Amino acid sequence: MVTILDTINPDAKRVRHPEKAHRPDTEVMRKPDWIRVKAPTSKGYAETRAIVKEHKLVTVCEEAGCPNIGECWDKKHATFMIMGEICTRACAFCNVATGKPNALDMAEPENVAKAVKEMGLSHVVITSVDRDDLEDGGAEHFEKVIWAIRAASPATTIEILTPDFLKKPGALERVVAAKPDVFNHNMETVPGNYLTVRPGARYFHSIRLLQRVKELDPTMFTKSGIMVGLGEERNEVLQLMDDLRTADVDFLTIGQYLQPTRKHHKVESFVTPDEFKSYETVAYSKGFLMVASSPLTRSSHHAGDDFARLRAAREKKLLMAAE
């Protein structure tokens, strides 16, 4: 089975995951009761969807098949995915389409900014596909989107979730210089899984990227997330936490991997809520300012509320250090 989807133009059918078509179908495990969600039907959801379509925007909520879309869109929260809906990578877990991307939409920064203002967002999350085809990996486009939002909605805090800018010298520095409030780059999984789960990326490059953000701007909040249920061992997750703390990462998110189609990496296990709580406790003991760990945790879920708590946690830490 190969999924076909186009959320903006339903008539433009295309193979979504051509690189996975040759793979044998894998069994999709039945979800336990603790990760069941209701279908989105609310008025708020419909209004958010209408704004997204009006401005011809792409959201990771739709493209990645996020289970929290109903809850977030009902509250007028959305994570905008810039630089198109086609990614140059082919991660085994991801539902975003793979292929040759289109040219950048030069009107996109202004369109995103208009949507942010229209939705009255106090906090916005901007992510993107990987654009290995671009000389700077899309750094300039990130910069333009941040600037446009600042101009249209100055009070809105901005969180970015970036690709790894692998082999793109100067790209990270350009994005950090644009001064987002939160810089998020997801590790996704433990290093032992990278060859099968995230083959186009390099674990220690991603760790170094997060570390470099703090070197460039020590005041910038950094954030990273992983999925569990991909066959990792507990000790591997704890080592990853240590690696992130070595890079001075402030905020860690941990959520359950959910298999998009039979062609994607299979779910090896459903991690229990108690185990997620245990990971949260350990992560706090290692020094993270904020930890979100639950089956339905995703990078942008409750991002606005979490940002307020993140700021409060830093202020508390600074006050305690001054005493």
Swiss-Prot record:
Matching Gene3D superfamilies: Aldolase class I (3.20.20.70)
Keyword Cell cycle: no
UniProt entry keywords in alphabetical sequence: 4Fe-4S, Cytoplasm, Iron, Iron-sulfur, Metal-binding, S-adenosyl-L-methionine, Transferase
Cofactor note: Binds 2 [4Fe-4S] clusters per subunit. One cluster is coordinated with 3 cysteines and an exchangeable S-adenosyl-L-methionine.
Localization (cell): Cytoplasm
Enzyme class: transferase
Residues bound to [4Fe-4S] cluster 2: 87, 91, 94
The protein's required cofactors: [4Fe-4S] cluster
Gene Ontology molecular function, alphabetical: 4 iron, 4 sulfur cluster binding; lipoate synthase activity; metal ion binding
Pfam families membership: LIAS_N (PF16881), Radical_SAM (PF04055)
GO cellular component terms, A-Z: cytoplasm
This enzyme's EC code(s): 2.8.1.8
UniProt entry tagged with the keyword Membrane: no
Pathway involvement of the protein, from the record: Protein modification; protein lipoylation via endogenous pathway; protein N(6)-(lipoyl)lysine from octanoyl-[acyl-carrier-protein]: step 2/2
Superkingdom of origin: Bacteria
Positions of the Radical SAM core domain: 73-289
Positions with a binding annotation for [4Fe-4S] cluster 1: 61, 66, 72, 300
Alphabetical list of SMART domains matching this protein: Elp3
Family per similarity comment: Belongs to the radical SAM superfamily. Lipoyl synthase family.
Name of protein: Lipoyl synthase
Organism: Rhizobium leguminosarum bv. trifolii (strain WSM2304)
